[in-house]
Amino acid sequence: MTTAATPSVGLVGWRGMVGSVLMQRMQDEGDFATINPVFFSTSNAGGPAPSLAGPAGGDTGRLEDAFDVETLAKLPMIVTAQGGEYTKQIHSALRSRGWDGLWIDAASTLRMNDDSIIVLDPINRDVIDKGLANGTKDFIGGNCTVSCMLMGLGGLFKNGLVEWGTSMTYQAASGGGARHMRELLSQFGTLNAQVSSELSDPASAILEIDRKVLAHQRSGIDATQFGVPLAGSLIPWIDADLGNGQSKEEWKAGKETNKILGTSGDEHIIMDGLCIRIGAMRSHSQALTLKLREDLSVPEIEKLLDADNEWATVVPNTKEASMEELTPVAASGTLKIPVGRLRKLEMGPQYISAFTVGDQLLWGAAEPLRRMLKIATGNL
């Protein structure tokens, strides 16, 4: 099933939203030419596998059963975007029978385990390489906002220049999943339908339009996925309530930042803030306050950010550039991580503001997995 040149790789969850983006990126970059893909399905085992440009001329055969541990265990690598429940069920079953292959996973289930590494190679390639050399087998994608933050501000974080920071996020509907994105658009459409005749009349009273919209938001709009209306509003809480006033999404900021960077002791970075769901489709934004360990000028900071990786894009701190380049609309569907609103704050010379945007489905989810697979197969 595997040769030294073209290892077999199990692919699970490839039809979902993150999985679909991952498959498209792998096709775009020619990744299937370096592996023998083995496609698995949780619902259509035996059906035809997708035809992709791999070493077997695109013939990838039939879909395997994603719950067939025996078949999975024959593979040296598995990449999954099937979700946390699948990981809980299958990962432990594989490990308990002695499988020692590489598990590359988009779900958060294994993310904070001591024996796993959160993958974001432009930021922590040294951590990944050390893990591979030391026998680490579980490589997990990070939280989307944390990954996008570090990609944009890597020049500060990697150089040990951040003492602490707060991150106030503006997170897109895609973070909830495909159904959440559909619900957001449906809510916008429903609200528009309530007042379409009034909107077509320039003489109609805007306060009456607003009253009708608000009444529908409060009583008649479908919010099955989000729980409350998001269109024309926001949701000031994401993920579980930890019982201490903090959401799980907010807890991830500090925990994952330090795990990705491998920082501890005196190098530990304190990160906290609030996570907010807004009516954007697929790009997360965040406003940051950072206390630096040194007094750096804004041009020095911009130079560090620009030099760190090819995807971080410094946006000039002007109204025009910010409105055009530092938005979810500008970032969505691209690998660019715009970072702007960089300036010194009134609190002191070591305090700066920053604003980053990144596609939640690319650097926030699929791209780190794609690149980890290339690293694991010796192609990056």
Regions found by a protein language model. Give the residues of each.
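Glycine-rich beta-alpha junction loops
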Residues: 43-45, 144-145, 169-176, 222, ...
